C-alpha cells in the first residue's frame, strides 16, 4: 500500500497519515509540504516523518523573486527533519518557466550553496525517491 498527501489541508493530512499508518500503508509522501494548503511547520513535518512519510520539497522556478528565501526555508527545514526522510523534486515544465532539468539543477545548486553535501543531495534526489517507489 502507498499514499500521497497533496492538496489537502493540514489537519486532514495528518489524520490521513495516522490512519494510513494504522492500516499498514508502507510508502507515504507529503508533497509540497511547505506550500499551501498543507503549509507544514517543522514540528508537523517531524510528526509526518515519524508516521513513515517522506517529506517532499519542490524546487519551483529559480528565477522567481522569492526563490532565495524559499530555498533558505527549505534548507532550514531539511536540516531539522534530516535528509533521510526528504525527497527533492521539481514541478517545472510550464510555459515561461525554466526546463525541469535546468530548474532542478538550480535547486540542487542552491542546496549545495546552503551547505548540503553531495551525499545528502544524492540521498534526497535519488536514493529516497527510489525507496519510495520500491526500487531499492
Each language-model region and where it sits:
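Short acidic/histidine-rich active-site segments
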Residues: 58, 83-100
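Mid-to-C-terminal alpha-helical segments outside catalytic/metal-binding sites
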Residues: 103-136
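Divalent metal-coordination and catalytic microenvironments
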Residues: 3, 55, 91, 121, ...
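Histidine/acidic residue-rich metal-binding segments in metalloenzymes
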Residues: 1-29, 37-53, 68-88, 102-114
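Active-site-proximal loop/turn and secondary-structure-junction residues that shape catalytic pockets
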Residues: 7-11, 34-36, 59-61, 92-94
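His/Asp/Glu-enriched short active-site or ligand-binding loop at hydrolase and phosphoryl-transfer sites
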Residues: 52-64
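Catalytic alpha/beta core domains of metabolic enzymes, predominantly
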Residues: 64-67, 96
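A generic structural motif
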Residues: 31-36, 122-124
Amino acid at each position: 500500500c502507498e499514499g500521497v498527501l497533496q492538496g489537502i489541508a493540514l489537519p486532514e493530512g495528518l489524520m490521513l497519515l495516522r490512519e494510513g499508518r494504522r492500516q499498514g500503508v508502507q510508502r507515504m509522501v507529503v508533497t509540497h509540504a511547505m506550500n499551501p494548503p498543507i503549509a507544514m511547520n517543522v514540528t508537523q513535518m517531524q510528526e509526518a516523518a515519524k508516521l513513515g512519510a517522506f517529506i517532499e520539497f519542490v524546487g519551483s522556478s529559480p528565477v522567481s523573486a522569492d526563490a532565495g528565501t524559499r530555498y533558505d526555508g527549505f534548507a532550514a527545514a531539511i536540516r531539522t527533519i534530516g535528509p533521510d526522510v526528504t525527497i527533492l523534486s521539481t514541478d517545472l515544465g510550464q510555459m515561461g518557466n525554466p526546463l525541469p532539468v535546468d530548474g532542478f539543477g538550480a535547486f540542487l545548486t542552491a542546496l549545495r550553496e546552503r551547505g548540503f553535501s553531495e551525499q545528502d543531495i544524492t540521498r534526497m534526489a535519488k536514493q529516497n525517491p527510489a525507496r519510495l517507489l520500491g526500487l531499492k
